[in-house]
From Swiss-Prot:
This is Carboxy-S-adenosyl-L-methionine synthase. Homodimer. S-adenosyl-L-methionine binds at Y38, G63, C64, S65, D89, N90, D117, I118, N132, R199. It is an enzyme of class 2 (transferase). Pfam families: Methyltransf_25 (PF13649). Its EC number is 2.1.3.-. It catalyses: prephenate + S-adenosyl-L-methionine = carboxy-S-adenosyl-L-methionine + 3-phenylpyruvate + H2O. One of its GO terms (molecular function) is carboxyl- or carbamoyltransferase activity. Belongs to the class I-like SAM-binding methyltransferase superfamily. Cx-SAM synthase family. Catalyzes the conversion of S-adenosyl-L-methionine (SAM) to carboxy-S-adenosyl-L-methionine (Cx-SAM).
Length: 245
């Protein structure tokens, strides 16, 4: 695993963050050092995917990046249990790594990949859809339509697993959460310059919202059974169930 040092040198101006080949090379280290509870998140989501998967349906991983969750899902599925998994990302460098990692997958796994903007992706017959740290990079005006289409693509009894970086409606609590997040990154070896430059690079690229905004949007899409199953300061992971009629 290559260490993330993308922002270890002064950059003027700091370019906007993008998922290019340089980021892909260090992405796994970046995730482990920048996303609180990342390993637990992936481990439990894979178990949830295996639990809710219905025969002859699909699992979609929207924003699959380098395939960490997809590998975990393959491990979590019962032996000799056929399943279909579709990994989607709009970064071809990410998908290149993901495809390589998924070459030695179980024979019962039908795995495919699509290099696509999820706003244009056609989805259907899904029992599990995962949207990890992806919606936050989509313009807010487009987010409701994506969730509407996810709800329509799910079969009854299917689930959406949504993880996002969030902000708090209360300014003081939002600042507290940010401070503890930067403390977390510093404890994982990032310098103050790296933290500052990464924050600048993400400005207007990653646009977080409140948990209330996410819940309202999920409700409008049709999800009436929603829970926050994992939360760490300004990171939250939701499970949204499309109930059987």
């Amino acid at each position: 695993m290559t260490k993330d040092s993308l922002f270890s040198r002064p950059q003027k101006p700091v370019p906007p963050f993008e998922f290019n080949a340089s980021v892909v090379e260090v992405f796994d280290d970046m995730l482990n050092r920048s996303v609180p509870c990342y390993r637990e998140l992936i481990h439990r989501q894979a178990q949830l995917a295996a639990h809710f998967y219905q025969p002859k349906t699909r699992i979609y991983d929207l924003g699959c990046s380098t395939g960490n969750l997809d590998l975990a899902i393959c491990s979590a599925m019962d032996a000799a249990r056929p399943f279909e998994l579709v990994g989607v990302d709009n970064s071809e460098p990410m998908l290149k790594v993901c495809r390589e990692r998924m070459r030695e997958t179980p024979p019962e796994a039908n795995i495919s990949f699509a290099c696509s903007d999820i706003r244009n992706l056609e989805m259907s017959n899904a029992s599990v859809i995962i949207l990890n740290l992806t919606l936050q990079f989509i313009p807010p005006a487009d987010r409701q339509n994506i969730l509407n289409r996810i709800f329509q693509a799910l079969v009854p009894g299917g689930i959406l697993l949504l993880t996002e970086k969030t902000v708090h409606a209360h300014a003081g609590l939002s600042e507290l959460q940010q401070d503890f997040y930067y403390r977390f990154k510093a404890e994982n070896g990032y310098s103050q310059m790296e933290i500052s430059q990464k924050r600048e690079a993400l400005e207007n690229v990653l646009i977080p919202e409140t948990m209330e905004s996410h819940r309202k949007r999920l409700d409008q899409a049709g999800f009436k059974a929603v829970d926050t199953w994992l939360k760490w300061f300004n990171f939250a992971s939701f499970i949204a169930l499309k109930e059987k009629s």
